[in-house]
C-alpha cells in the first residue's frame, strides 16, 4: 500500500508540509497568485526543435545547452493544458532545478510552443507517445544520467498513464505528478459548475485560439472548420469535435474514459510522488485515489489548501512557491544519490 500524507495547514516545519499564505488560503487566490509572483522567466532558455518520426515536431526549452550539461541530473517538465515554459509552475521549477545544478527542460506538447504543429493530430491527456519518444531520445542523445519527470495537470495525467503503461522500462528514476485530473469525465462536468466555469472559459479560449492558428497554417488538419470552431462553448464539446475525432475515440466520453489515469495507478512501478489539494477548483473529489489502489512505490500527498497548481506560502512581501522546494527536495534522493 502507498504512503499517504495529509498536510495540516496549521503546521510548517519543512518543505514536505504546505502552509498557505496567511489570508490567502482561498482556492481561487491560490490558483491565480502564481501569475502575479512568477510573471517572467528569470533565466535565458536554450531552445531546441526536436523532429518526430511522423514528420511533426516538439519544442524543448532547456535551462542551458544540454550538450554542455549532459553529465548533470535531469528534470523533465510536462506542462498542463495549453501550458508552456511561460507557465509560472514550469519556468519556476526549471529555475529551481538550475539552482541545484540540475539540467531542466520543458517538453512542449505539439502546438504549445507558439507555432502550430504540422500533422493531423494535437495532444491530449492520454497521448504518451511523444513523451516516451523524447525520454528515450534524451538518453540516446546525451547518454545516461539520473532523470526525473514532473507532470502538471493534464501533463500529470499523461505522465501517470505513461508510467503505468511502461513500468520499469520507462527511462526515468522517479516522477512527481501535481494537480492531475485522474478522472477526466468527472472533472469535465465539474468545470461546468459554479466559479469553475470561469476557468473553463479561459482554457477554452486558449484551445480555440490555438486551433484557429493551426487551421490557418495547415488547413484541413483538424476535423472541423473555423466557423464550427467559433461555435464551441465547452471544453467537452471541443474534445468531442476535435480531440476525440482526430485521435480515434468515439466521442469525448470515450476519450475521457480511456485516458483517465485513475484505473492505471496501481501499475506505476517507478518511485512517484502525487500531490493534490482538496480545494482544487478544477477537480472533482473522484480524482483522490483510494490508498489500497496505490502501489508501495507511490507516495500520495493531499493538502487542505493549494488550489490548482498553486501552493503559495509565505507572505505577500516574501511569497514562497512551495512546489519549487517540495518537488526538488523529494527528487534529490533519486537524482543526486545516483549521480554521485
Give the label of every model feature segment:
Residues 26-68, 308, 312-318:
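N-terminal cap/lid segment of alpha/beta-hydrolase-fold proteins
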Residues 71-80:
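Short beta-strand element of the alpha/beta-hydrolase
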Amino acid at each position: 500500500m502507498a504512503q499517504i500524507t495529509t498536510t495540516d495547514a496549521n503546521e510548517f516545519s519543512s518543505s514536505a508540509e504546505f502552509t498557505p499564505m496567511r489570508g490567502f488560503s482561498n482556492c481561487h487566490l491560490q490558483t491565480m497568485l502564481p501569475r502575479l509572483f512568477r510573471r517572467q522567466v528569470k533565466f535565458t532558455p536554450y531552445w531546441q526543435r526536436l523532429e518526430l518520426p511522423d514528420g511533426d515536431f516538439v519544442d524543448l526549452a532547456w535551462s542551458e545547452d544540454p550538450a554542455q550539461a549532459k553529465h548533470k541530473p535531469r528534470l523533465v517538465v510536462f506542462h498542463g493544458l495549453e501550458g508552456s515554459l511561460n507557465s509560472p509552475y514550469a519556468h519556476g521549477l526549471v529555475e529551481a532545478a538550475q539552482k541545484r545544478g540540475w539540467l531542466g527542460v520543458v517538453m512542449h506538447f505539439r502546438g504549445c510552443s507558439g507555432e502550430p504543429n504540422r500533422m493531423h493530430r494535437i495532444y491530449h491527456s492520454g497521448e504518451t507517445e511523444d513523451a516516451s519518444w523524447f525520454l528515450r531520445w534524451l538518453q540516446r542523445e546525451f547518454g545516461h544520467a539520473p532523470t526525473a519527470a514532473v507532470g502538471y495537470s493534464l501533463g500529470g495525467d499523461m505522465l501517470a498513464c505513461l508510467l503505468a503503461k511502461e513500468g520499469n522500462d520507462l527511462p526515468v528514476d522517479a516522477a512527481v505528478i501535481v494537480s492531475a485530473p485522474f478522472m477526466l469525465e468527472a472533472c469535465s462536468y465539474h468545470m461546468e459548475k459554479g466559479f469553475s466555469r470561469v476557468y473553463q472559459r479561459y482554457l477554452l479560449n486558449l484551445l480555440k485560439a490555438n486551433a484557429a492558428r493551426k487551421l490557418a497554417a495547415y488547413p484541413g488538419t483538424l476535423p472541423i472548420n473555423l466557423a464550427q470552431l467559433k461555435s464551441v462553448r465547452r471544453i467537452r464539446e471541443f474534445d468531442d469535435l476535435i480531440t476525440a475525432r482526430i485521435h480515434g475515440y468515439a466521442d469525448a466520453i470515450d476519450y475521457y474514459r480511456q485516458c483517465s489515469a485513475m484505473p492505471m495507478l496501481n501499475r506505476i512501478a517507478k518511485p512517484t510522488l502525487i500531490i493534490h489539494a482538496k480545494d482544487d477548483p478544477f477537480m472533482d473529489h473522484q480524482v483522490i485515489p483510494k490508498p489500497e489502489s496505490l502501489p508501495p512505490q507511490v507516495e500520495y500527498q493531499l493538502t487542505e489548501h493549494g488550489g490548482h497548481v498553486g501552493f503559495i506560502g509565505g507572505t505577500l512581501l516574501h511569497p514562497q512557491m512551495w512546489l519549487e522546494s517540495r518537488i526538488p527536495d523529494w527528487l534529490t534522493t533519486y537524482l543526486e544519490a545516483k549521480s554521485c
